[in-house]
């Protein structure tokens, strides 16, 4: 889903989304086409051979190993670098997402991945499930969990972030500025395609690989960029309908 993620970052920085207001795909607007061209040109200019098929972990591993100086990712990179190649660990930091213009807001909505914890209404063990969730968020246990990967695991509870027993962790103190950058983005971001609420289209955008195939078509097959974008937009809309999406 790297192709979808990177294109999403670009169009979000331009104030747009990968979905139009009517629920159809947005790959042929001026901002989307500009983003496709930007990432295509960047790939051709600086990417290593074979990287066209990289997944999220492949790109992250290059950063862990000190083979690339940049990645769109989270605070888990702190432990990843420390484990794989410790020499650059004092030189890494999180920065706000790139902006179109210096005058644009530093922190704009882009992307957040959420893992919900729920107690199902139809569950036969609702009481036990609720008790388990309450146990997980017991202050001491929750802080212990957050400290298992400090800087990567970030508190969802505001009062925990103010707890001295949480904030006193050496890694958290060392990377406090970077952690704040990440938390600021988390507070305004949403899942790709869910900027206006849960939509079936969101899963299609990130799981079907259609945007990634579009990049293949442009880079490997030499397809004209606008032609490839129109074809991808058409295929995405067909996939949305097949998945039962509501299109206005």
Description of each model-found segment:
Residues 77-88, 100-209, 247:
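C-terminal lobe and pocket-closing loops
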Residues 1-25, 31, 68:
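Extracytoplasmic/periplasmic solute-binding protein
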Residues 51-65:
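Short helix-initiation/N-cap motifs at beta->coil->alpha
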Residues 227-230, 234-248:
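Short, low-complexity disordered leader/linker segments with a strong preference
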Residues 216-230:
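Short, charged, surface-exposed loops that flank catalytic or proteolytic processing sites
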Residues 22-53, 93, 97:
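Glycine-centered hinge/linker elements that transmit conformational signals in sensory
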Residues 65-74:
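Alpha-to-beta junction loops
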Residues 1, 75-76:
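Short secondary-structure boundary segments
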């Amino acid at each position: 889903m790297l192709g979808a993620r990177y294109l999403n970052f670009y169009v979000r920085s331009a104030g747009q989304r990968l979905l139009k207001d009517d629920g159809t795909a947005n790959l042929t607007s001026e901002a989307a086409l500009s983003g496709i061209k930007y990432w295509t040109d960047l790939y051709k200019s600086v990417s290593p051979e074979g990287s066209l098929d990289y997944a999220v972990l492949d790109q992250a591993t290059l950063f862990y190993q000190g083979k690339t100086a940049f990645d769109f990712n989270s605070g888990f990179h702190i432990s990843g670098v420390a484990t794989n190649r410790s020499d650059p660990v004092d030189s890494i930091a999180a920065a706000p997402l790139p902006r179109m213009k210096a005058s644009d807001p530093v922190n704009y909505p882009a992307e957040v991945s959420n893992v919900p914890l729920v107690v199902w209404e139809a569950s036969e063990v609702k009481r036990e499930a609720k008790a388990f969730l309450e146990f997980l968020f017991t202050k001491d246990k929750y802080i212990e969990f957050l400290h298992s990967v400090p800087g990567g695991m970030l508190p969802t509870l505001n009062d925990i972030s103010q707890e001295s027993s949480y904030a006193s962790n050496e890694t958290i103190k060392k990377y406090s500025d970077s952690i704040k950058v990440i938390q600021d983005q988390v507070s305004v971001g949403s899942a790709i395609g869910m900027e206006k609420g849960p939509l079936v289209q969101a899963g299609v955008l990130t799981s079907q690989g259609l945007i990634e195939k579009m990049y293949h078509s442009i880079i490997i097959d030499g397809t004209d960029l606008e032609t490839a974008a129109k074809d991808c937009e058409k295929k995405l809309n067909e996939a949305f309908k097949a998945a039962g999406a509501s299109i206005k």
